[in-house]
Amino acid sequence: MGSFSTIMASFLLFLAFQLQGQTRANPVYGSVSNGDLMDFKNLLDRLEDKMPLEDEVMPPQVLSDQSEEERAALSPLPEVPPWTGEVNPAQRDGGALGRGSWDSSDRSALLKSKLRALLAAPRSLRRSSCFGGRMDRIGAQSGLGCNSFRYRR
């Protein structure tokens, strides 16, 4: 067994020395010479010179005419005039939405009934910020999202 471990140790050392030269980092930019980079830069400059600018290809007036024609062809809906801030009588009375007009007495009666219901609710429901319950263990509940303290008066 001693000879086997000696052979394995020497084999591992041999592999370590052989692979040492191959494990160096080879950056990508190291394989490209400066001359090649300059050639690429010159080629890019020549291509940019040959490519016309967008403004030179089509004047802005032609672009705006073309865009209006395309908009008209693409939008099947008629254009809606801008809102002037005036409300017609049907909208003012709530007729446009199918609702009748509410007078102030109806509104105040509704608000009063909601406030009474809120005040009539138990104090624990009004002031605890609970939104659910959670089962910690079988038979043991704890409040989920509830305040950890109680209000005292």
Swiss-Prot record:
The keyword Hydrolase does not apply. Keywords: Cell projection, Disulfide bond, Hormone, Phosphoprotein, Secreted, Signal, Vasoactive, Vasodilator. Residues 26-123, 93-103 form a propeptide. GO terms for molecular function: hormone activity; hormone receptor binding; neuropeptide hormone activity; neuropeptide receptor binding. The modification Phosphoserine is found at residue 129. This is Natriuretic peptides A. Residues 54-105 are annotated as: Disordered. The keyword Nucleotidyltransferase does not apply. Transmembrane segments: none annotated. Belongs to the natriuretic peptide family. InterPro entries: Natr_peptide, Natr_peptide_CS, Natriuretic_peptide, Natriuretic_peptide_atrial. GO terms for cellular component: cell projection; cytoplasm; extracellular space; perikaryon; protein-containing complex. Residues 147-151 are annotated as: Important for degradation of atrial natriuretic peptide by IDE. Disulfide bonds join 130-146. The record marks 123-124, 130-131 as: Cleavage. Residues 1-25 form the signal peptide. The precursor molecule is proteolytically cleaved by CORIN at Arg-123 to produce the atrial natriuretic peptide. Undergoes further proteolytic cleavage by unknown proteases to give rise to long-acting natriuretic peptide, vessel dilator and kaliuretic peptide. Additional processing gives rise to the auriculin and atriopeptin peptides. In the kidneys, alternative processing by an unknown protease results in the peptide urodilatin. GO terms for biological process: cardiac muscle hypertrophy in response to stress; cGMP biosynthetic process; cGMP-mediated signaling; female pregnancy; negative regulation of systemic arterial blood pressure; neuropeptide signaling pathway; positive regulation of cardiac muscle contraction; positive regulation of heart rate.
